[in-house]
Amino acid sequence: MRPGDIVKASNGKTIEIINTDAEGRLILADCLALAVADGHEVVVDIATLTGAQRIALGNNYAGAMSNHERTRSAVVRAAETAGELLWPMPLPPQMRPLLDSTVADLKNIGGPLGGMLTAGLFLQEFVSAKTKWVHLDIA
């Protein structure tokens, strides 16, 4: 895989490779697409996805992003009960254009700032709106 390559995910979306170090999200995106295709109503993924997570939240907290507020809140409460530090993070729609590509459906990274959030927005592209999804970035 090289910068400029175009890959196709299992759900048919095309992805322009900008950064070859952002390969984990490609694999996770396919897993999410397959979980949706299999009809799962709730999907929680856990990944050491971005170094930007540690920059945003430090070494002790993991970030939780979701397309469903109540499901994310339930996961955060469960983490608290287990003694884990989990912090709710947004999926800001105004950052989604950072993933736009002129040659594919989206790029595999969104730019130099907000890396944890754009990674979450990237993954959200592979989950249907009716699937309750929570992404935990535990880097």
Feature annotation, model-predicted:
Residues 1-139:
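A generic structural signal for tightly packed, nonpolar segments enriched in small/aliphatic residues
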